[in-house]
Design a protein with these regions (language model features):
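Basic, gly/Ser/Thr/Pro-rich low-complexity segments located predominantly at protein N termini
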Residues: 45-50, 114, 134-136
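Conserved beta-strand-loop-short alpha-helix elements that form
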Residues: 127-135
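Conserved small/polar residues in nucleotide/adenosyl-binding loops
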Residues: 145-149
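N-terminal lobe of the biotin/lipoate ligase/transferase fold
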Residues: 1-86, 108
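Acidic (Asp/Glu) carboxylate-rich active-site/surface patches
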Residues: 79-121, 130-131
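Cytochrome P450 core scaffold surrounding the K-helix E-X-X-R motif
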Residues: 136-143
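Short glycine- and Lys/Arg-enriched binding-loop motifs that mark or flank ligand-binding interfaces
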Residues: 36-41, 49, 95, 100, ...
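Residues at beta-strand starts and edge strands
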Residues: 54-56, 124-128
C-alpha cells in the first residue's frame, strides 16, 4: 500500500477533521500533516494541546479495505515506536490502546476513526491520526501529561 498524495498545511484545526472533509480527494491512501494543530482531539473527545512548531501532527486516510481494521491503532503504535527507536534511539513503551510513553510521559497519541464516503455514504474508510511531541521542555510533560489519557 503506497501513499498517493501527501499534503502539508502550515496550520490546521485537526488533521483527522481535514482528512475526513477531503477524504475522496486523496485516492486509495493519502496523508496530511502540520506542525500547528489548533483543534486537535484524542479518544473520547479529549482535547490534544497544540505546541506550535514543537510537535508533528498527521493523518493517514485509507480507502483500501483492511482485513482487521481494529488492529490499526496497535499497528500504528508499533510502527511509530519502531521508527523512533531506529532513527533516534528513543525507547518508548506502548500504553494500550493509543499512546506511546517515554519515562512515563506521553510523547505520542494515536486516534483512528472510521469514515463513510461516496454515494449515500456507502463507502468505508479509516483515518489514522498521530501526534508526536518533538521538542517539548520537561515542564510541558509535567503539566500536561502527568496522567496519560
Amino acid at each position: 500500500m503506497s501513499i498517493n498524495e501527501v499534503r502539508y498545511l502550515p496550520e490546521c484545526g485537526s488533521t483527522n477533521a481535514y482528512a475526513k472533509e477531503h477524504f475522496e480527494e486523496f485516492g486509495p491512501v493519502g496523508a496530511v500533516y502540520t506542525t500547528n494543530q489548533t483543534a486537535g482531539r484524542g479518544r473520547l473527545g479529549r482535547s490534544w494541546v497544540n505546541a506550535e512548531g514543537k510537535a508533528l501532527y498527521y493523518t493517514v486516510a485509507i480507502r483500501e479495505p483492511l482485513a482487521q481494521p481494529a488492529t490499526l491503532p496497535l499497528l500504528a503504535s508499533l510502527a511509530v515506536r519502531h521508527q523512533l527507536q531506529l532513527r533516534y534511539g528513543v525507547d518508548c513503551q506502548i500504553k494500550w490502546p493509543n499512546d506511546l510513553l517515554l519515562n512515563g510521559k506521553k510523547i505520542v497519541g494515536i486516534l483512528c476513526e472510521s469514515v463513510s464516503y461516496g454515494y449515500q455514504q456507502q463507502g468505508r474508510g479509516i483515518l489514522c491520526g498521530i501526534g508526536i511531541n518533538l521538542a517539548q521542555p520537561q515542564s510541558y510533560f509535567c503539566l500536561l501529561y502527568t496522567s496519560p489519557s
